[in-house]
Design a protein with these regions (language model features):
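Glycine/proline-enriched, intrinsically flexible loops and inter-domain linkers
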Residues: 64, 68-164
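A broadly conserved detector of short glycine/acidic/proline-rich loop/turn motifs that flank catalytic sites
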Residues: 2-4, 10, 19, 43, ...
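Structured core elements
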Residues: 36-40, 52, 59, 98-100, ...
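Catalytic cores of large soluble enzymes that bind and process phosphate-bearing ligands
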Residues: 27, 31, 42-52, 89, ...
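Phosphate-backbone binding interfaces of nucleic-acid-interacting proteins
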Residues: 1-77, 211
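Short amphipathic beta-strand starts and helix->beta connectors
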Residues: 19-28, 82-86, 195-196
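Conserved mixed alpha/beta core segments that line enzyme active sites in large multi-domain catalysts
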Residues: 21, 132-205
Length: 213
């Protein structure tokens, strides 16, 4: 419990596959003896390029003339599934990118990823959700996964209707105003843009098709 205080889960873990010798300290075996630097975001609110681990590494690389590992670019396959996206408020959202992934199975993330998410104070959920949080922490780019089977007729980026309600992932219901920007389908808002997703389209153990925002 002291190693993973932010997790509500309790389970027995078989450590045989890790291959370390008996007597190895648990923190060393599970790579939990690293150093964590906590940087107060108030000191760099004007530097969004530093809002991720890679940005901090790039800054340190520039200051101390150290080598910086490159991030490999990924080109999606040409046969990506078609999914309609419409932006109705281009002033507040000039660009929206999403890709549909089909026939997936929701599994637990690899232990290394879970461990890294734990260590920065977040809670692992499953591989699909964890990878979006992992990318956000690494690159400072928030992403989100929608259950595609619960999205009706594509994605629309629009202003919320006055007093429109949205049930968030954390169980809270918001009463929105026309100043709020939402991600919506043809029926209702499904996420508060740039803030939090809604419960309607959340990824569950039964999810097999997703929209990666």
């Amino acid at each position: 419990d002291d190693l993973f205080p932010v997790s509500d889960d309790h389970e027995i873990m078989d450590l045989t596959s890790f291959g370390f010798a008996a007597g190895t300290p648990l923190a060393e075996a599970l790579d939990l003896d690293d150093i964590i630097l906590e940087i107060d975001n108030k000191s760099m609110t004007n530097r969004p390029d530093l809002w991720g681990h890679y940005g901090i590494a790039r800054e340190i690389s520039a200051l101390y003339d150290l080598p910086l590992a490159k991030i490999e670019a990924y080109t999606p396959p040409a046969n990506v599934a078609d999914f309609p996206i419409e932006i109705k408020d281009t002033d507040r959202c000039p660009r929206y990118i999403g890709v549909k992934l089909e026939n997936l199975s929701v599994k637990a993330s690899p232990f290394e990823m879970q461990s890294r998410i734990w260590r920065v104070g977040m809670r692992p959920i499953n591989a699909l959700v964890d990878v979006t949080n992992y990318v956000m922490l690494a690159l400072g780019q928030p992403t989100h996964v929608f259950d595609a089977d619960n999205i009706s007729d594509g994605i629309t980026v629009r202003r919320a209707e006055s007093k429109e309600e949205l049930l968030l992932l954390n169980g809270k219901t918001l009463e929105l105003s026309n100043d709020d920007l939402v991600i919506a389908d043809s029926e209702s808002a499904v996420a508060l843009a740039g803030v939090m997703g809604g419960a309607k389209d959340s990824v569950l153990d039964t999810t097999s098709n997703v929209i990666l925002e």
